Amino acid sequence: MKTKAGFVALIGKPNAGKSTLLNTLLNAHLALVSHKANATRKLMKCIVPFKDKEGYESQIIFLDTPGLHHQEKLLNQCMLSQALKAMGDAELCVFLASVHDDLKGYEEFLSLCQKPHILALSKIDTATHKQVLQKLQEYQQYDSQFLALVPLSAKKSQNLNALLECISKHLNPSAWLFEKDLMSDEKMRDIYKEIIRESLFDFLSDEIPYESDVMIDKFIEEERIDKVYARIIVEKESQKKIVIGKNGVNIKRIGTSARLKMQEVGEKKVFLNLQVIAQKSWSKEEKSLQKLGYTHQRNRD
């Protein structure tokens, strides 16, 4: 069997549809999806097998990254650091741009990325044929920069094979790097954490999801049931009250939604215990961020 394997950094502005694309390619719910921008905070490896036209069985290891953005808050700097690290580690990049975005995000990407890349135009199902053609023409001025320009829709599964074919074409022959049926090397407790965070985005509005995070305090993995004890961390007592809700209605909704998604992903029953705490300025303190698994790589002179 002829095989290929390689790491591919998936880069884009917030809300470009990176996580939706990966979940569609995997046919599974692993990456956090939200209608709110900038929901993804950590790098995640997603492993997609693909047989290309040349007969190669390719193992494409996508590095799902936080959206490219610049803010002074330390948490946001940690997120940008992860995206930059992914670009450095990958042998190929895919820049995902919404058909509704201007070209500034891609121009910023070009200033940061030194690796060969494919430009993918997402959400074409939400635009007219004329709008898609116009946007493709706008990007053509950079045709010497990218390997290929692929319009696609993750929601409608349009042109996804074309993207995978293009990626596989530019990977080198190699033995597979992971087991055949593995979709991610993420630990289940980390996947469960992201599912709880996704439920926060689903049920809470305004700034609260962005000023909150989740700490898994205890995780017990048994044959028939997983037991998860977690804390939702917010910055203000007023936010804590909103997360809990009157008579606990909000925290019950968040917990029920998260538990059902966990059971679907883990394919077993899940017991979920959620607590809510207020911790002032957690997103600005390096020690707090390290406990939550965030790291910041500072630039060296």
Curated annotation (Swiss-Prot):
Biological role: An essential GTPase that binds both GDP and GTP, with rapid nucleotide exchange. Plays a role in 16S rRNA processing and 30S ribosomal subunit biogenesis and possibly also in cell cycle regulation and energy metabolism.
Pfam family, one: KH_2
Annotated region (G4), positions in chain: 122-125
Quaternary structure, from the entry: Monomer.
The protein's name: GTPase Era
G3: annotated span: 64-67
Membrane topology value: Peripheral membrane protein
Organism: Helicobacter pylori (strain P12)
Residue ranges constituting the Era-type G domain according to the UniProt record: 4-173
Region described as G5: spans on this chain: 152-154
Compartments, as annotated in UniProt: Cytoplasm; Cell inner membrane
Gene that produces this protein: era
MF annotations from Gene Ontology: GTP binding; GTPase activity; ribosomal small subunit binding; small ribosomal subunit rRNA binding
Region (G1): 12-19
NCBIfam families the record matches: era, PRK00089.1, small_GTP
